[in-house]
Amino acid sequence: DFNAGDVANAPDRPRIVGDAVSHYRKLAHKRPAVAFCVSIADAEKAAERFREAGYRAVAISGESDPFERDRALTGLRDGSLDVVCNCALWVAGVDVPSVSCIILLAPTKSLTKYLQSVGRGLRTHPGKDDLIVLDHVGNVARHGMPTDEREWTLAASVKKRGATERSEVPVKTCQKCFATVAS
């Protein structure tokens, strides 16, 4: 996968996170959201940026006290939190059906990690009609749409698409509304 330190220290990192906050405000304002960040420090900075913009946001990680992690989960469920920023903690094994926005701030070469991250928002929930994915790191272009059909096999003879190869289904992004669709 990408080197987390290199990504977190990239010169344009503050702009990427800032854009995530403005795009959340524009496209998913107040929707329960989970942001996937590259490091614990990155998650803390992202949560701080969301709080500065007036959102109720926290950062959690594997180093967080279990009570803090439970409180974040409860906060998304009961609406007392808007955004939970995490670093590799909620990729799998967490079920918060009310989440209707996923914010991708961590690039990954792993299709599985990408699909599991987006999957945190694909649960059905009363009153939830859709999921908004704010991809600020090119994971959709890298792996395709989460809903793309994929051939899964255990056969060793089938050549699998390499982790760094581009998606077989090209995507394009509207520069006005930032919607990404298969092209």
Where would I find each of the regions flagged by the language model?
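Conserved interdomain linker/interface between the two RecA-like ATPase lobes of SF2 helicase motors
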Residues: D1-V38, S157, E165-R166
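Short, surface-exposed connector motifs at secondary-structure boundaries
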Residues: R25-P32, A53-R56, P97-S100
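A generic secondary-structure signal
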Residues: S22-K26, R49, G75, R120, ...
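A short beta-strand element within the Helicase C-terminal
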Residues: D82-K109, K113-R120, D130-D135
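C-terminal helicase lobe
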Residues: D78, L111-Q116, R120-S183
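Conserved helicase ATPase core of P-loop NTP-dependent helicases/translocases
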Residues: V34, D42-A92
